[in-house]
Amino acid sequence: INEDINEEWISDKTRYSCDGLKNQRIDSPYLKIENKFLKTSWEEAYKKITDKIKNTSSDKIAGLTGDLTNMETAFIVKEFFNKIIKSNYLDSRTENIYVNINDRKNYIFNASINGIEDTDLLILVGANPRYEATILNARIRKAYLKNKTKIFSFGDLGDLTYPYEVLSNSTSEINKFFQDKIDLSEKLKKSKKPIIIIGQSALKL
């Protein structure tokens, strides 16, 4: 239980995720031998990986974590590459979306999770919190119930469990917003505790 994050609640996606597991999912390591994947033990797999790393220059080794990788595993992979392999060739953007990681503000969520409840204006750009971050969506709903927070979205997201105003999701409309050329730009200036949530899909525009 973490009162600052989920307040002991879990989403339906979390509760029933076990029903979505496929019986043909990967449950053990496989080695590719003569163009065929053969089941093997973890010990044998680790031995093969170790041998490959020992006999390969660090500038020839790269790592890629997928969208379903949990934070702990991703961090361990990063530490392994930075401290053991001595390589920075590591990425997690499976869709090749550019994010400058040299500046922290490009990838951190500046507001705290529970701090969302205090916002008076929330803007969604390329983000659907109900399906992408259910805990976040629950906090946004609390913000609306608690403060009647004004919520805007570039694009219709369907039922988010709270009312919001839909704006055009065209790149020109989003560009006008950031150039202070639409009404929402003025609302942002007058807001005391605004939050803008930019989702990954916005980077594909």
Task: Locate the predicted segments by residue.
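Catalytic alpha/large subunits of respiratory electron-transfer oxidoreductases
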Residues: 1-205
